[in-house]
Amino acid sequence: MKSKIIYLIIYIGITLAFSACSDNTDFPDEPDTYENIAIVYWMGDNSLSGAAVRDIKELVQGKDKIPTNSKIIIYADTASAFPVIYQLDAKNGLKVWKKYTKEEDCTDSITLLNNLKTIVKNFPAKNYGLTFGAHGTGWSWRQRRALGPDDNDRSADKWLNVPTLRGVLQELPHFKYIFFDVCFMQSIEVAYELRNVTDWVVGSPAEIPGPGAPYNLITDALCEGDAYGIVEGYDSYYPNNRYKGVVLSAVNCNELENFTATTSTYIKTFFADRHTVSSTVAQNIQKYSSEFSSFTYCYDMNSIMPYILSNEEYQQWVEAFDKAVPLRKASSGKWTTSGHCNNPYIYDSEHFGGISMYIPQEGADGNAKNNELKHYQWYKDAGWNETGW
């Protein structure tokens, strides 16, 4: 457990870093209902604590872009302090809204639900957006871990998986967007699982740069629910002196069911009787991980399809794909990796899709992932349940 003394030191440090920050919660002329509330939920009780603090500083730097009658609400759990909820707007700057007096597991589903319900209750709004900061493993890795970890007791990392996240978010108002400033989260399995709780899913199918999004450049987009603005602002910041680039996309959830119906026809046909792509074909498909890393399920969805469809079929399919994933960005043609990919380049630029899809695989590791895929709605609705996989 963290001591109150450590908490006090960290709190004072953050307060000094953000000159506008105080624990005064008296705000004159607060509206009954806000136009926009952008929630940033930082799971930083791990090696990303410093990144969480830097991101809050960037949000403060961009506060003048926050529209009238809008706020950014930040929940931050870091390794050196108890969780804090901040509120940020253009007029008042950054203020502490709630200081926790004990540790909590920020990845626990009940904790997440209670924290988000508290924010929604106290900051009623017409529109909500939700951003996650964390480590990420996509849709599948060791018992379906996806977001986190929270390692406050230093004995075992605790993560939040995507089906559980979907269950939490179903209990809350519909979101304009969910933005994962997190590695590997932009997959069709994740986006489809969340299709009924948000209009847009924004994220990367690959690793993201260490600093993540340049929040000072996208504060207005976060508040306005502008998925395109989030992607464009993020992409515009990279590459820089240290980081090669970033891969991003925005998924229109309103198109996902039609897109999945189109895709399922081809999945059921090509992958019937446990058929799969050959190893030679797999080598040519755009990947966001190395062949033998823990992330071998990160194949670019648009890069897969030309290998399993005729030209005519592909043209019909890609028309639906372009509606579902209308924005894909990788301006530098490469991305920064910490070792999960030995070829971090967009080498199939013609079919760059900006979203990954799992291809079932044989072998022990493949069988584990194949079984985990069955926990996702994508497995049934995309037709995988009829292929023998």
Segments from the language model and where they lie:
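Short, solvent-exposed loop/turn elements at domain surfaces
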Residues: 46-50, 82-83, 364-369
